[in-house]
Amino acid sequence: MKLNKKHLVAILSVLSLSIIVVPLLTSCTGDIPELNPAEIINTLFPNVWVFIAQVIAMCVVFSLVLWLVWKPTNKMLDKRREYIAKEITDAENAKQEALQYLENAKSEHLAAQAQTLEIIAKAKSESLTLRESLEKEAREAADKIISSAKISIANERRENLERLQSEAREAAYIAAEALMKKELSREDNDKLVDQFIKELENNEK
């Protein structure tokens, strides 16, 4: 704490009173005779010049003490106060920097998290789109295969039917021609029918 003028005046007053009171107390240790006012003044101030010299000496000593002790001490205290204030300021600055760094880290973390979620959502959307496209292509390919198979089966059935009809006409023509050449018995007729049926079955195979 820095001393002001009031503190200095109080210290000087205490020292002055001590110079005055100490001789008085010393003189009062013995038997105290009855003193008149003049003797009391002479006892308190036996010699005015000695008192003045003591006051001057006290002021000189106090000035030396103030010069040799107080100023270096005050200077050291000022440096200490400046050092403490600097440490407090540095601590506050470090705290603010740490808070700012924490805020930046939080912002970067949130941004990275949002970007990650966006990438995941985009990947899911692209995967769903690709799956739907592949399913559509697969359905179209399957429909084409089924349609082609149906057409092929229908063509093959038509060709077989046409071939069977042609063979049946040919067989009927041959049978009619054979019947015209000779008269068949019941047994020969059954044989011709059985032979015609077997030929149809063989042709179907």
UniProtKB/Swiss-Prot annotation:
<keyword id="KW-0813">Transport</keyword>
<dbReference type="GO" id="GO:0005886">
    <property type="term" value="C:plasma membrane"/>
</dbReference>
<keyword id="KW-0812">Transmembrane</keyword>
<keyword id="KW-0564">Palmitate</keyword>
<comment type="function">
    <text>Component of the F(0) channel, it forms part of the peripheral stalk, linking F(1) to F(0).</text>
</comment>
<feature type="lipid moiety-binding region" description="N-palmitoyl cysteine">
    <location>
        <position position="28"/>
    </location>
</feature>
<keyword id="KW-0066">ATP synthesis</keyword>
<keyword id="KW-0375">Hydrogen ion transport</keyword>
<keyword id="KW-0732">Signal</keyword>
<dbReference type="GO" id="GO:0045259">
    <property type="term" value="C:proton-transporting ATP synthase complex"/>
</dbReference>
<keyword id="KW-0406">Ion transport</keyword>
<dbReference type="GO" id="GO:0046933">
    <property type="term" value="F:proton-transporting ATP synthase activity, rotational mechanism"/>
</dbReference>
<keyword id="KW-1133">Transmembrane helix</keyword>
<feature type="transmembrane region" description="Helical">
    <location>
        <begin position="48"/>
        <end position="68"/>
    </location>
</feature>
<protein>
    <recommendedName>
        <fullName>ATP synthase subunit b</fullName>
    </recommendedName>
</protein>
<dbReference type="Pfam" id="PF00430">
    <property type="entry name" value="ATP-synt_B"/>
</dbReference>
<keyword id="KW-0449">Lipoprotein</keyword>
<dbReference type="InterPro" id="IPR002146">
    <property type="entry name" value="ATP_synth_b/b'su_bac/chlpt"/>
</dbReference>
<feature type="signal peptide">
    <location>
        <begin position="1"/>
        <end position="27"/>
    </location>
</feature>
<keyword id="KW-0472">Membrane</keyword>
<dbReference type="GO" id="GO:0046961">
    <property type="term" value="F:proton-transporting ATPase activity, rotational mechanism"/>
</dbReference>
<keyword id="KW-1003">Cell membrane</keyword>
<keyword id="KW-0138">CF(0)</keyword>
<comment type="function">
    <text>F(1)F(0) ATP synthase produces ATP from ADP in the presence of a proton or sodium gradient. F-type ATPases consist of two structural domains, F(1) containing the extramembraneous catalytic core and F(0) containing the membrane proton channel, linked together by a central stalk and a peripheral stalk. During catalysis, ATP synthesis in the catalytic domain of F(1) is coupled via a rotary mechanism of the central stalk subunits to proton translocation.</text>
</comment>
<dbReference type="InterPro" id="IPR050059">
    <property type="entry name" value="ATP_synthase_B_chain"/>
</dbReference>
<comment type="subunit">
    <text>F-type ATPases have 2 components, F(1) - the catalytic core - and F(0) - the membrane proton channel. F(1) has five subunits: alpha(3), beta(3), gamma(1), delta(1), epsilon(1). F(0) has three main subunits: a(1), b(2) and c(10-14). The alpha and beta chains form an alternating ring which encloses part of the gamma chain. F(1) is attached to F(0) by a central stalk formed by the gamma and epsilon chains, while a peripheral stalk is formed by the delta and b chains.</text>
</comment>
<feature type="lipid moiety-binding region" description="S-diacylglycerol cysteine">
    <location>
        <position position="28"/>
    </location>
</feature>
<dbReference type="InterPro" id="IPR005864">
    <property type="entry name" value="ATP_synth_F0_bsu_bac"/>
</dbReference>
<comment type="similarity">
    <text>Belongs to the ATPase B chain family.</text>
</comment>
